């Protein structure tokens, strides 16, 4: 099991990033909350990782904090929630926002996330309510607010749309969400954050 990687950030395009660790390039999938904290390519990055083994592939997921990884690992144990959906949840809201939704039984906010229907949202509330108590305190206490600058993408609008599609949004819906906030930010990470925030209103 690969639990942590430290190396040079080679490239990033949500949800994928490439990390060079002593000459070996690791392709890693990460939630948008982690992308917000990444430096520009060439900077040093430490990621807490989870190796997900499937019949057809071994996929490495990376997280900015141990608490975020702990929440991911707990989410994929919920019936009907796979790694892709867990990544979409962590991309669509902070750990503290998710915790609040679960504790308050706020199904309405959860169904706004891509790929989550009412039954899945209700299952998340039921199954995660007890599990939250065993997770690191940071999951429920920290806001996980986006921070740190990242390199401006050559085409931030297209990158932002592609990122939303990879999270489960339909192409037309992703384009509509990004178009609505296009004039409010320049970096793809900021466009994505604003678009996702708008879906929760």
UniProtKB/Swiss-Prot annotation:
Record-level Gene Ontology MF annotations: ATP binding; four-way junction DNA binding; four-way junction helicase activity
Keyword Cytoplasm: yes
Region of interest (Domain II), residue spans: 65-143
InterPro entries from the UniProt entry: DNA_helicase_Holl-junc_RuvA_I, Hlx-hairpin-Hlx_DNA-bd_motif, NA-bd_OB-fold, RuvA, RuvA_2-like, RuvA_C, RuvA_C_sf
Keyword Transmembrane helix attributed: no
One GO CC term, this protein: cytoplasm
Domain of life: Bacteria
Leader sequence residues: none
Subcellular compartments: Cytoplasm
Similarity comment: Belongs to the RuvA family.
Name of this protein: Holliday junction branch migration complex subunit RuvA
